Amino acid sequence: LPMTGAVIVSTPQKVALADARKGINMYQNEKVNVPILGLVENMAWFTPAELPQNKYYLFGKEGVKRLAEEMHVPLLGQIPIVQSICENGDNGTPEVLNDGSQTGQAFMAFARRVVEETGRRNAEQAPTKIVEVKK
């Protein structure tokens, strides 16, 4: 199947950023040549339920944002760590449906950015070729 583009997900830790960089380089390699729609930072910060305005950067601050700038790809979003993601997921309710929450809004903003970047990519670039893996 041809790929419209790749979304690279990383956490802000240095080792995760190194892996994300390798992924970007792989997709941008002329043999693969799949456009990068952008990066998303997972576990960007921790926000406790009782202090929803506080942000604790447990794994580093804005590492994916810096990588996006360095690699010249869009930053599609930053998703915090909050207990409700796990709880709602376990209950079968995606966090994105909780539009009153900061996290639900972050997921919606990320989804909108993916749609925007996909539309931009499709308007500006030819369809990708099917990536063939040869033995």
How should each PLM-predicted stretch be described?
Residues 105-119:
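Acyltransferase
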Residues 19, 102, 106:
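Charged catalytic carboxylate motif
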Residues 91-103:
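C-terminal boundary of histidine-terminating zinc-finger modules
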Residues 33, 116-124:
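Charged, solvent-exposed alpha-helical segments that act as regulatory interaction surfaces
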Residues 109, 113, 124-135:
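A short, charged, Gly/Pro-tolerant segment at domain boundaries
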Residues 3, 97-98, 135:
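Short, charged low-complexity intrinsically disordered segments located at boundaries
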Residues 1-87:
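Conserved catalytic-core segment of NTP-binding enzymes
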